[in-house]
Amino acid sequence: MPAHLLQEEISSSYTTTTTITAPSSRVLQNGGGKLEKTPQYVEEDIRPEMKDDIYDPTYQDKEGPRPKLEYVWRNIILMSLLHLGALYGIILIPTCKIYTLLWAFAYYLLSAVGVTAGAHRLWSHRTYKARLPLRVFLIIANTMAFQNDVYEWARDHRAHHKFSETDADPHNSRRGFFFSHVGWLLVRKHPAVKEKGGLLNMSDLKAEKLVMFQRRYYKPGILLMCFILPTIVPWYCWGEAFPQSLFVATFLRYAIVLNATWLVNSAAHLYGYRPYDKTISPRENILVSLGAVGEGFHNYHHTFPYDYSASEYRWHINLTTFFIDCMAALGLAYDRKKVSKAAILARIKRTGDESYKSG
């Protein structure tokens, strides 16, 4: 489809928005660790059917020391072995056939989109709707990524938004870079994560047969899609050596996808600008967006979690938005939620850090 026609298709499907002016409060954490209250406004009610990913300013951490960390040694050992295998895969890259490298890159893109367009923007935030063929594709691609099943991923992510930067946030960035990057997967969840996560309304995903099917058969699914298939195809189809197939196409590719996603939780909460809301931790981080196919515009995303682009700028360093728009042009995605420019500019004027550049 010509670019101008695709652009018309994109514009024609945006959801009409309604402005509301009810303010609430938000906690501001500044560089010195001081906490203060600052107004937060919800500009548009463009996704009235779900509110469990909207920040809850009333929740506060309980006073007193955190519970002692309980290490999950199985995860520590498996993650260590995976990354050792990935390092060996880097050494093997010069000995790989070009088809193997292309295969690994394609598998990385597919699995990344399964997380970003699937688990994140579709199932966690309901920022757009997808017809059955697209949902099937996204469930398969998400299984290729092996980052917990969609139900668990979405539950943790909704808790991350609703209770951001508190003990009920599964990967609370106030606990440091390592914890928010991978450490949270190596220890037992904080009791507040279990308590508050268990209270979230997950009825939409419980009613989604594909999501429940994936959850039921997740272990054999990830064994096949994340490990066996990416290893067997290069070895069988074009005669790649088995070590290159295993360590490059599987271990290295999987480790890259994992770390690209983790950087959204760590680097994009610590490094970058906050043009939309300086009162929250998430930042705009272009490097993260490159690796995570469009998920690095994190200050925007936490300010407007109901926007299907997770960014103001649609396709700018945002392969996921491009993918969703292409699916919309094919009739497979629809009802894409998009925040109006007026609402964005109004929010920037109220809470931005003055780093905003229109474009």
UniProtKB/Swiss-Prot annotation:
GO terms for biological process: unsaturated fatty acid biosynthetic process. Fe cation 2 binds at residues 160, 269, 298, 302. Its main location: endoplasmic reticulum. Its EC number is 1.14.19.1. This is Stearoyl-CoA desaturase. GO terms for cellular component: endoplasmic reticulum membrane; membrane; nucleolus. Residues 1-72, 119-217, 264-359 are cytoplasmic. Keywords: Endoplasmic reticulum, Fatty acid biosynthesis, Fatty acid metabolism, Iron, Lipid biosynthesis, Lipid metabolism, Membrane, Metal-binding, Oxidoreductase, Phosphoprotein, Transmembrane, Transmembrane helix. It comes from Sus scrofa (Pig). It is a multi-pass membrane protein. The histidine box domains are involved in binding the catalytic metal ions.
